[in-house]
Amino acid sequence: TLLDYGCGKGRVDFFLSAQTRCQSIGVEYDDRIYAKAMENKKAAASGARTEFVLESAENFPVPVEVDRVYFFNPFSLEILRKAMARLLESCYENPREIQLFFYYPSDAYISYLMTVPELEFLDEIDCMDLFPGGDSRERVVIFTIQE
């Protein structure tokens, strides 16, 4: 199951649920954007495999079935720390490997993540060729929480 923090209107959730047939949970804090995601779910082919929750990341209890997490630089470093604490708490209670995907991460995110002892850096995918401008943040950085 994929957990998408700051899911917006649900595009990533719908796409990945359709392409990989995974279940997805989108967490959104803004009630107006959440309403759009719920509206989009009605028309999405993969809507039955997607769930949206109106909640702040730091208060969302991570379900035991979550094994993939996607972040599109959704919130401040302070909130990331709290969300990571929730993820780690879920892993302590129900040991499992979780892969974390950070798209367009800030330097502050990477600096913090490199200091979390439970995280292991897995890979970095350069995405600078997708858009003009050569933005070095156009990348996906992957970490894992080991069982």
Where are these regions (language model features)?
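Conserved class I S-adenosyl-L-methionine
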Residues: 1-8
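Glycine-rich SAM-binding Motif I of class I
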Residues: 10-14
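Gly/Ala-rich phosphate-binding loop of Rossmann-like dinucleotide-binding domains
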Residues: 17-18
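Conserved SAM-binding motif I beta-strand of class I
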Residues: 23-28
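Conserved short alpha-helix immediately C-terminal to the canonical SAM/SAH-binding motif I
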Residues: 32-33
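S-adenosyl-L-methionine
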Residues: 36-63
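A short SAM/SAH-binding and catalytic strip from SAM-dependent methyltransferases
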Residues: 68-79
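C-terminal substrate-binding/active-site "lid" region of AdoMet-derived donor-dependent transferases
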Residues: 78-139
